[in-house]
Amino acid sequence: MNPASTSHATLQGLLRHARQRLEAAEVDAPRLSAEIILCHALSLRRIDIMLTPDRIVEEADCILFSELVARRATGEPLAYIVGEKEFFGRDFAVNPSTLIPRPETEHLIETALESLRSGPARFVDAGTGSGCIAVTLCAERADLSGLALDMSAPALATASHNARRHGVAQRLAFVRGDFTTSLLRSGSLDLYASNPPYISEAEYTGLSREVRDFEPRSALVPGDTGLEHAAAIIAEATRVLRPHGILLMEFGCMQGADMASLFTPYSTLWEMVEVRRDLAGLDRFIFARRNLLQP
């Protein structure tokens, strides 16, 4: 879009040019992307575009819109362009330091809420990223509190912002650390939740450009196999969970059998280890419950 030709641009005209540009760039859902970017750039609702398609747009707004569309045409995720992503009915700030929350992780939240005992409970969210798991758990239940871990200081700052945004910051502690960070007493938690990096090096090269070229590699790839963090998470969860405490850990849809096998050294300490599926019917996360024995 040529900024010099935008002095009399209308909403529908901008939308048409943006859609054509995004179609040419082979971006997913080009019309929807154009509408969302236009609403973001002009602080509009989508209904405003429908009701006033011939509204004249100021040149400065046209230029801003054109710049944002150009970013989308490179494959940059829409969530990074508008600065947020919806998760479990709430908007979360995201940026290139954080993984963009995925819908399949919402099933982990649902399982946690269904499985936790009533009354006050404590959890850890290891590899918190945007904080979507930790913040959502606290927002859904006022009697939950927890610790959110991440190695990325910018990600922790984003997660802390999201906690304040949704009014749960007083029940969350944000700490820089990895999956081996032992900050908690043995037997002190009711839930260990984690969506760790689990993409293998081979899988990474085949990811879409939106993921591979823009989302933080460290939040996606732990090493050659994709399972490099899993054993450490299981060991730490075995230590810090109370009797009947729950481990929920997300993984890749082809990793279920390998993930379950990592519990073998701790088989006497877990009363239940299950591979759970997401709403698409794909293996997606481990559900495990500690027994009464101490490690």
UniProtKB/Swiss-Prot annotation:
GO molecular function terms attached to this record: protein-(glutamine-N5) methyltransferase activity; protein-glutamine N-methyltransferase activity
Lineage, opening ranks: Bacteria, Pseudomonadati, Thermodesulfobacteriota, Desulfovibrionia, Desulfovibrionales
UniProt KW Transferase keyword: yes
Domain of life: Bacteria
HAMAP family attached to this UniProt entry: RF_methyltr_PrmC
A GO biological process held by the record: methylation
Gene this chain is encoded by: prmC
Homology family: Belongs to the protein N5-glutamine methyltransferase family. PrmC subfamily.
Catalytic activity: L-glutaminyl-[peptide chain release factor] + S-adenosyl-L-methionine = N(5)-methyl-L-glutaminyl-[peptide chain release factor] + S-adenosyl-L-homocysteine + H(+)
Protein name per UniProt: Release factor glutamine methyltransferase
